[in-house]
């Protein structure tokens, strides 16, 4: 039954009705994802997700790298849909090194792509790949070095995205579905010379995108110009996502829309009220899913049932969670 439901979900296009609550998920930091970690997640949050987002970088060379079968199996065993955020970069001496588009398009990583696609095909079950997410942030500058991030970046990104998807199709990995996922706010922004950095400018085409995604956060009042170099403010879910949501649905109105990373702090407002509004607006917009960034990173975004019981209750009021009965009882 579980496999049938997930296969039905991936029989796109899929758009929730206004009466449907979105699927609930968590985005997790660290690799691999194990059944032990997922059990800890359920204990910590009181929630068993429909979707689990995780992250994997590429190898520094163009040969084979790890295929995340352990993580995929662990997520699947919990009756959840895996979503791999696949980052074309690697770490060297603690620094992120972005893989250049010329290396990917020139064939240096063809062996890696073939090996990964063939492993995905043999694994056989459906999962999402969120390739090179948040491409409209100069923090990533996918396909170029930081100095090369500029007006040519959208076209570079499109070529990379299409090349990767077409490689998977060439090797029969049709169980993989592809997510295009910009950030809610583009950086650089506010600069007339950066008008090229609109999320929709990066869109690689309907034929290689199955799911539309959005990332964005409410930092509340946690950041100050004096300490952090920028001033955060309280933002509602609607303030964060509406402009991007409207842009994406104009771009591809028949494709499902997900929030793959979000979270809210309490500083400056009420996180529980924020989450309530988020889920209400998600129904109105017919979002297919919302994934909470369950990570202690720049700030501690994590939900914890011991301090966030009311917020957890709001989430449990949605569709029955795997491992829970309707209404949220275990």
Give the predicted meaning of each segment:
Residues 3-15:
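Sec-dependent N-terminal signal peptides
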Residues 19-111, 264-266, 291:
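N-terminal substrate-binding region of glycoside hydrolase catalytic domains
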Residues 19-32, 127, 255-330:
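Substrate-binding cleft of secreted/luminal carbohydrate-active enzymes
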Residues 27-28, 161, 165-197, 254-267, ...:
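Aromatic-lined carbohydrate-recognition surfaces of secreted/lumenal glycan-active proteins
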Residues 38-48, 66-84, 115-124, 201-207, ...:
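Acidic (Asp/Glu)-rich catalytic clusters
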Residues 62-65, 69-176, 180:
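Substrate-binding cleft of extracellular glycoside hydrolase catalytic domains
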Residues 66-87, 207-267:
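Glycoside hydrolase catalytic-domain groove-lining segments
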Residues 183-213, 269-279:
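Substrate-binding cleft/loops of secretory-pathway carbohydrate-active enzymes
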């Amino acid at each position: 039954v579980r496999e049938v439901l997930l296969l039905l979900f991936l029989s796109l296009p899929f758009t929730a009705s206004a009466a449907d609550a979105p699927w609930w998920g968590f985005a997790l930091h660290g690799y691999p994802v194990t059944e032990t970690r997922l059990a800890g997640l359920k204990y910590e949050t009181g929630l068993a997700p429909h979707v689990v987002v995780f992250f994997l970088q590429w190898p520094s060379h163009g040969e084979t790298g790890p295929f995340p079968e352990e993580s995929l199996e662990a997520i699947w065993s919990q009756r959840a849909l895996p979503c791999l955020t696949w980052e074309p970069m690697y770490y060297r001496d603690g620094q992120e090194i972005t893989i250049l588009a010329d290396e990917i398009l020139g064939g240096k990583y063809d062996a890696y792509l073939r090996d990964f696609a063939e492993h995905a095909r043999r694994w056989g079950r459906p999962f999402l790949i969120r390739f090179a997410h948040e491409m409209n942030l100069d923090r990533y500058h996918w396909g170029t070095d930081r100095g090369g991030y500029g007006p040519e970046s959208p076209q570079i990104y499109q070529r990379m995205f299409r090349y990767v998807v077409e490689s998977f199709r060439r090797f029969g990995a049709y169980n993989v579905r592809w997510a295009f996922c910009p950030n809610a706010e583009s950086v650089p922004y506010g600069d007339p010379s950066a008008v090229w950095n609109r999320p929709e400018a990066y869109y690689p085409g309907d034929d290689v995108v199955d799911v539309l995604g959005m990332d964005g956060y409410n930092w509340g009042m946690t950041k100050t110009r004096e300490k952090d170099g920028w001033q955060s403010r309280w933002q509602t879910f609607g303030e964060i996502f509406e402009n991007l949501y409207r842009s994406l649905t104009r771009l591809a109105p028949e494709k499902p829309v997900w929030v793959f990373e979000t979270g809210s702090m309490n500083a400056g407002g009420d996180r529980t009220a924020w989450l309530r509004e988020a889920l209400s607006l998600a129904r109105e917009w017919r979002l297919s899913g919302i994934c909470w960034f369950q990570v202690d990173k720049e700030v501690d975004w994590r939900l914890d049932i011991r301090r966030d019981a009311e917020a957890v209750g709001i989430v449990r009021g949605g569709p029955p969670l795997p491992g829970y009965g309707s209404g949220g009882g275990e």
